[in-house]
Amino acid sequence: IIHGIDFVLDVLDFDQRAQDADFIIVGEGRMDQQSMAGKAPVGIAQRTSAKATVLAICGSLDQEISDYEAYGISACFSIIGQPESLSEALDNAEVNLRRTSLSIARLIKNVRGNCID
């Protein structure tokens, strides 16, 4: 018996495809203690080479989670930019995801000193 994420990563030939990556970006609806217990983002982070930085984008981030680096995730970014109800967060998810992704892309561009198209 293997973990589901390991099966999926094997089928996708993840190790080979990600071997030269500088960054791996993972996603999670809500990053919480359950996420740290072996859900996809942690499974991916644990299979990522030490040279790659793993970043997580999540719908919401449990403030109790501060040790994600111990699981191989360098930084977590919640897409929620302001207090809002769950209904509003779901309605605004696409806009919030685009905004957060653009901010991360700009950060990577500044760190690398290269253009991102």
Label each residue range with its predicted role.
Residues 1-117:
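N-terminal loops that bind phosphate or other acidic moieties
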